[in-house]
From Swiss-Prot:
Reactions it catalyzes: an N-acyl-L-aspartate + H2O = a carboxylate + L-aspartate
The protein's Enzyme Commission number: 3.5.1.15
MF terms (GO), sorted A to Z: aspartoacylase activity; hydrolase activity, acting on ester bonds; zinc ion binding
Binding site for Zn(2+): H13, E16, H105
Name by which UniProt lists this protein: Probable aspartoacylase
Binding-site positions, substrate: R55, N62, R63, E163, Y276
Amino acid sequence: MSGIQVLLVAGTHGNEINAPWLFEQWKQKDSLINTHNINIQTVIGNPVALEQGKRYVDRDLNRSFRKDLLLSSDLNAAEHFRALELVSEYGPNGNNPCQIAIDFHSTTSSMGSSLVVYGRRPADLAIVSLIQNHLGLPIYLHEGDNAQSGFLVESWPCGFVVEVGPVPQGLLHFQIINQTLLTLDSCLKEISNVINSKTVYPEQLIVHRHLKNIDFPRDSSGVPSSLVHKDIQGRDWYPIKNGHPLFESLSGDLTLLLEGGLEEEFVPVFINEAAYAEKNIAMSLTKKEMWDVQKDWINDLSKLLNP
């Protein structure tokens, strides 16, 4: 067995209960999941929030891993201390160091199974290209959004998020569990292939690059004055063009997409995600792009997993 360790995180948000439930079943029956001969560490990201059945206690744990927050001694939120605990125990220089972190989430949006990467770290892009090639999952590349930062997986040399939906918060769902299992198996299989030099990389990677967040239209008191338009509700990953309706009020007033040229396509994701209401995000707008898989991506991942 390789000395490489992979950290699997569930329950980073305490009201996303499917992956934590799956981890508990795995603990009771270790043959449930094929580890592909990889050293695995599993952890509940925010156990207190999970016990309380809410997204977080004091602040979003998945926005609490900024370096300035981790280095600060003047913080008192429960999630600040939890972020420090996780990095101290499982970070690359921790007591039980892991090289890759995979953070399992669920979403109320119709995202299906998808992967999320933050920025353009070569090793991240290499591993998700393999998983996409195996399962065909869409990839959301989140970058250039200073208001949303400090994500858990960024504290590890390589890491990404698995999102599965739609499912209401706090609800166990058979299909969500199955999709999570399928994606987890693919993740571990592809990591094992890299470690054992059995990898065949695709020529290209398809990403949906983050452009901007879009809020609901609001009235003078800050209350949403329109609803997500019926033609895009539940249609994450479907392209739309300039002039397409995004929102509609009860009186029929439309808010249109006014972005780019007339024929340019954009792809909305995380449409009407319940957890993002507090962040004033009704959806995120992305641009679908096809990138050639680069040698430096492959080399970085190989060096990380075969030191």
